[in-house]
Curated annotation (Swiss-Prot):
One Gene Ontology biological process: TOR signaling
PROSITE patterns: FKBP_PPIASE
Annotated family: Belongs to the FKBP-type PPIase family. FKBP1 subfamily.
Gene Ontology molecular function: any one: peptidyl-prolyl cis-trans isomerase activity
GO cellular component: cytoplasm
Protein name: FK506-binding protein 1A
Source species: Emericella nidulans (strain FGSC A4 / ATCC 38163 / CBS 112.46 / NRRL 194 / M139)
Function according to Swiss-Prot or TrEMBL: PPIases accelerate the folding of proteins. It catalyzes the cis-trans isomerization of proline imidic peptide bonds in oligopeptides.
Length: 108
């Protein structure tokens, strides 16, 4: 259980976020059946959040810290690292494993 990081394309290999950093990310989230439930690319701008401090799901808090600036990866988050037994009705069902394709654009 946890988060699996599958690298798609490398980043700079030097600049990694630390807990508490604010990051700019593009992401697309999908359910196990491949259906998209959310994407920052469907909105203007990027998704900006503080990472590693509980502002986002645990899978992101741990997975994004492993990415360097410019890197693209899939974060596969088991339910305990996503929305758990409650899910996020009506978008995410209970006990859902979620996949996020994430691109770390910058550390702000």
């Amino acid at each position: 259980m946890g988060v699996e990081v599958q690298r798609i394309s490398p980043g700079d290999g030097k600049n990694f976020p630390k807990p508490g950093d604010t990051v700019s990310i593009h992401y697309t989230g999908t359910l196990a059946d491949g259906s998209k439930f959310d994407s920052s690319r469907d909105r203007p701008g990027t998704f900006v959040t503080q990472i590693g401090v509980g502002r986002v799901i645990k899978g992101w808090d741990e997975g994004v810290l492993q990415l360097s600036v410019g890197e693209k990866a899939k974060l596969i988050c088991t339910p305990d690292y996503a929305y758990g037994a409650r899910g996020f009705p009506p978008v995410i069902p209970p006990n859902a494993t979620l996949t996020f394709e994430v691109e770390l654009l910058k550390i702000n």
